[in-house]
């Protein structure tokens, strides 16, 4: 079953043989490290190609021209490390991964080295990194925090032309309503290709609501 899912995901996203091999390495690494460090929900490993790989790859279809990405709370490298693996052959493509947990950073660094993924791993808190970044096309985060908090962390970038892409589950609309109490922004709710109840929130032109 997982082989069928793998083939379908690779076909849908027009993945080259070399990139497919690198994604196989990522999945093998994730499976190996999962035994010592709980990187993803154990029940999701059997559906890793749909739940994690395809879920990350769909962001490239939303922002195909983006070259510089910043992934907040990277954890198991979803979506950031997967995006970097898929973008290896693109000129200037680079993903910065921000993760405060040292063991997870070890996983990210080792897997990036094995797959040749163009990444920089920041073993630091988001607040210590994000204010010093510039030239970022996309800031993203999955399963990290409510949208209001993601916007607060991303404010230095989203007020300077960067686009936010934040995958959300069935509570996306409620999180948007809460965020709009504190922030003004342009947004799109993009249906997820991997979960009919999920959405990807695209955010631009962020500013704070006047008190």
From Swiss-Prot:
Intrachain S-S bonds: none
Function noted in UniProt: Specifically methylates the N7 position of guanine in position 527 of 16S rRNA.
GO cellular component, one term: cytosol
Subcellular localization, as worded in the UniProt entry: Cytoplasm
Family matches, as Pfam families: GidB
An MF annotation (GO) of this entry: rRNA (guanine-N7-)-methyltransferase activity
Family to which this protein belongs: Belongs to the methyltransferase superfamily. RNA methyltransferase RsmG family.
NCBIfam families to which the protein is assigned, alphabetical: rsmG_gidB
Gene this protein is translated from: rsmG
Source species: Methylorubrum populi (strain ATCC BAA-705 / NCIMB 13946 / BJ001)
Protein name as catalogued: Ribosomal RNA small subunit methyltransferase G
């Amino acid at each position: 079953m997982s082989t069928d899912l793998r083939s379908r995901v690779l076909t849908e996203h027009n993945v080259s043989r070399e990139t497919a091999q690198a994604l196989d390495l990522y999945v093998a690494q994730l499976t190996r490290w999962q035994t010592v460090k709980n990187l993803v929900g154990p029940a999701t490993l059997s559906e890793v190609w749909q739940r994690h790989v395809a879920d990350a790859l769909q962001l490239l279809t939303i922002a195909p021209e983006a070259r510089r990405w910043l992934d907040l709370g990277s954890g198991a490298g979803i979506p950031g490390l997967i995006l970097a693996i898929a973008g290896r052959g693109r000129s200037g493509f680079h993903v910065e991964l921000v993760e405060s947990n040292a063991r997870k950073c070890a996983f990210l660094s080792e897997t990036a080295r094995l797959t040749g993924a163009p990444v920089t791993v920041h073993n630091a808190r988001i607040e210590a990194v994000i204010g010093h970044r510039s030239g970022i096309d996309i800031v993203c985060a999955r399963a990290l925090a409510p949208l209001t908090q993601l916007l607060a962390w991303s404010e230095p970038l989203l007020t300077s032309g960067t686009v936010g892409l934040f995958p959300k589950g069935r509570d996306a609309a409620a999180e948007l309503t809460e965020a709009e109490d504190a922030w003004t922004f342009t947004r799109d709710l993009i249906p997820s290709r991997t979960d009919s109840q999920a959405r990807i929130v695209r955010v631009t032109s962020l500013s704070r609501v006047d008190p």
